[in-house]
Each structure stands twice: as structure tokens, then as C-alpha cells.
């Protein structure tokens, strides 16, 4: 059972996964050992899937974001497996979502520049054919947050 303290722990860890356990315990009014047990339980139960380092895209020379809307034209199991394998193999494609509406998928690409989009476009086309693709260049990131709201659990 998830309670207020568990949700608070999850929120704190999302904000800073390197926060010392002693500080988390203090903020949620628990002993360090009780807090440690809760964090371990949250991991075991799958609420915490892992811990990652968030990189500065400009410092690693990937400042450009392009969203690619894709209409596949085919919806057979074999084609979808090929599509999923193709997009999963390209590290510059950082997110893929299946959609409702006029397009089947939206892909988020992290690129060094706009010109590099053509390289990725050709890589994708080597593996799968599309009915339609439309690329959109992000002019500004207004909000980006990997943290999820915890008030729904």
C-alpha cells in the first residue's frame, strides 16, 4: 500500500536521485532505516524502475529536437515488428509513441543539427517503408520534465 510518505519519497527521488537517504528520511519524518526499507520496497514493487543521469544536450552536442510524424500504411504484425526494431536501433530516436488520429507514430529525435535529420531519415528508410512522414523542428523547449506526478497512486 502506497501512502503519503511513499509518494513524497518518490517525488524527492525524481527531483534528485542522488539525495542522501538521511535527507530524504528527514524530509518525510522517518528514521534512516525505515526510509531505506521504504525505498527498497518501492524498488522491489517496481515503482522505481532505475536511476539515470540526465545529460545536458547542448554540452553533448545534441541541441536540436525534431518530431517526426509517421503514417505506416501497413499494420501487420511483421511490419510493426520491423518498424519497432528499426526505430529502436537508432540512438538518436529517443522516444517513440503510437498515436490515434491521422498518424500512427510520433518520434522524438535528438540531433546535433537540422542537417543530420537527413541521415536519420535515410537510416529509417533502409529498414522500413512509410506511407507518409512529416518532420517538425522544435524552436523552443517550453517544458521538459522526467518527473511524474505521484498523486495518482
Swiss-Prot record:
Keywords: DNA-binding, Transcription, Transcription regulation. It holds the Pfam family AsnC_trans_reg. PROSITE patterns: HTH_ASNC_1, HTH_ASNC_2. SMART domains: HTH_ASNC (SM00344). One of its GO terms (biological process) is response to amino acid. InterPro entries: ArsR-like_HTH, AsnC-type_HTH_dom, Dimeric_a/b-barrel, Tscrpt_reg_AsnC-like, Tscrpt_reg_AsnC/Lrp_C, Tscrpt_reg_HTH_AsnC-type_CS, WH-like_DNA-bd_sf, WH_DNA-bd_sf. Residues 21-40 bind DNA. This is HTH-type transcriptional regulator Zrp. One of its GO terms (molecular function) is sequence-specific DNA binding. The lineage of its organism: Bacteria, Pseudomonadati, Pseudomonadota, Alphaproteobacteria, Sphingomonadales. Residues 2-63 form the HTH asnC-type domain. GO terms for cellular component: cytosol.
